A protein has these predicted regions:
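Short hydrophobic/aromatic patch on the recognition helix
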Residues: 79, 233-234
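DNA major-groove recognition helix of helix-turn-helix
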Residues: 237
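A hydrophobic/aromatic-rich effector-binding and dimerization subdomain
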Residues: 3-4, 93-154
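Histidine-centered metal-chelating micro-motifs
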Residues: 82, 86-92, 111
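Short acidic-glycine-tyrosine-enriched beta hairpin
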Residues: 71-86
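Short, Lys/Arg-enriched, Trp-marked, Pro/Gly-tolerant hinge/linker segments that flank
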Residues: 157-164, 178-207, 211-221, 225-226
């Protein structure tokens, strides 16, 4: 019986033709320097669902790219970002000939940042429920500048501190992402107060996160600990 999806890990992703990586745990892929007839990025998992064992961020600079994430369809255009968390099931459908993209894929270790634990988990949930958002041209320009710094740092094979630097750059991108999402929430009027019961659950959730975050990062795990459904916990946090 054919498996419903392929398991995709960073080791496999790091073997793609356009990939550069650090220890097969931090992978960059782009077609920014290619001419139009070379932009068709051939990947063995095109048009087949894959389950991700890592987090991936896709930045679209021009053109159109079609993907499906957890059965939801997305079309990326200029200055769009799609951030897909570990455990998601996605499918790459294709892109237009004029598409320019940059991809950052990394293990969960790189998602740990200097953000407070509650802010980090809040960002993680927001990205799980709403992985797609649009950047201003200036914000995308800053993001691509950081991407190029990451790529240059990976190329410094004689530098023993590359991982630390990449962790730092990832922190910058995470802070920026959280800022963009908070601004989007404010613009959309989505910041609603929690009821007393929800606030109590949220407080317990944060307490559990502080105890177990280095080992457990999934909403499902904490929902089980708190004896609620993952869906309800996601709505609260």
């Amino acid at each position: 019986m054919k498996q419903a999806y392929l398991d995709l890990d960073l080791i496999q992703l790091s073997t793609e033709n356009a990939a550069v990586h650090l220890n097969k745990e931090f992978v960059l892929i782009d077609n920014l320097d290619e001419v139009p007839e070379q932009t068709n990025m051939e990947m063995e998992f095109v048009n087949h669902p894959v389950k991700l064992s890592f987090t991936i961020a896709i930045f679209c600079l021009t053109g159109r790219m079609s993907v499906q994430i957890n059965l939801q369809e997305f079309e990326l255009r200029a200055n769009d970002i799609l951030i897909v968390l570990e455990g998601s099931i996605g499918e790459y459908r294709g892109m237009s000939d004029d598409t320019r993209i940059a991809v950052i894929a990394f293990s969960s270790e790189y998602f740990q940042t200097a953000l407070q634990v509650d802010a980090t988990m809040s960002l993680q949930h927001k990205l799980y429920s709403s992985p797609f958002y649009h950047l201003s041209p200036a914000a995308m320009e800053e993001t691509m500048a950081i991407y190029r710094l990451m790529k240059a740092k990976i190329a410094e094979t004689d530098n023993p501190f590359r991982k630390g630097v990449l962790l730092g750059y990832t922190q910058v991108l995470t802070y920026n992402s959280y800022k963009y999402l908070l601004a989007a929430d404010a613009d959309d009027g989505k910041l609603n107060g929690k009821s007393g019961r929800q606030q109590e659950l949220y407080t317990r959730f944060i307490r559990e996160v502080q105890k177990s975050y280095t080992k457990e990062r999934s909403i499902s795990y904490y929902a089980n600990v708190l004896c609620v459904t993952p869906k309800y916990l996601s709505q609260v946090v």
